[in-house]
Amino acid sequence: MKSDNTRPTFNKPRRYTRLIFQQGRPPIDADFNEAHEIQLQMLRSYAADLIGDQGAVGGAFEITPERGAEEGGTHPVKDLTIGTGRYYVDGMQCENGADAVKLSTQPFGGPTADDLLQKPITVPALVYLDVWEHHRTWIEDDVLRDPALGGSDTGTRSRTVWEVRLLSKDKWTADEKKNFAKKGFAWKEALESRDGANHGKLRVRFNAGAHGGGDCDVDADARYRGVENQLYRVEIHRAGMALPSSADPDDPKDPDKKKFLDERAHAATFKWSRENGSVAARWVKARDCDPADGTVLRIEGPRDEVHGFSAGDWIEITEEVDDLRRHGWYFCADQTRRGRCAYA
């Protein structure tokens, strides 16, 4: 969740049951957030123990094929209708509150009608429900800003979202193709094994530099010289090569750096933030820019100079629809001083 927090402290193996505030101690966001996480974990565990790892209320999320006109002696599946109601996955409640929701019109993602026209549903296919939490800030929901505080935002929100997904047979493994018709085939485990690549670990180290001053002295070459708490966030977009630790990034003649630049088509794509990715602003249409120039971006002004965007910074451009549909992200360099990025 890309919110401005000090740190996440909830740890399920510790089995804490509540948080106890003490007199004379400063309240911090990490304590409040952990208290909510403890109660949420207990509630979902309770629901999973009673219901099981999955279960529906009535015909909730029942899948009904929508077939088209006969073609070659068969009626191809054009779309899928998703039943109304509540469904539980590992204790997480997801709700479809609308009638006649289809695979192509579900609220939180999925293929569009054009996608299904270009690539029709082939039978057999695996249809499954994916459920996760989606973080929202005032940028996605302006109601989260408090008018009494001059429009400042306070807490962010998290909501449960869902998506009915299709896995066509041509994407199944050999074992899945062989055993899919067997009763009790472990589809859940098969799907979870596909996400193994997303559960990697990151090893980081701190470069103290050559500065030999006292604990209160700050290296003049340090990029960050503040004293406030920092929660670093790193996101890997594409796996690949990284600049070797032996290379000098500031030396254009460094052989390791030169080799890396020569092969950067295979380089990893990632981003990092000292503020847990919470430095964000709305991007809006530039009315006063040349319509023929598609490289000019207009964004709302940052909340302050420290947490704003500086010339030379890389900016990620995305929107909520892309996030939910897991589409690609776009990056551009903030070249404000050269007129390529303007503030509204």
Predicted regions and their residues:
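Subunit-assembly interface segments of extracellular/virion macromolecular structures
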Residues: 1-344
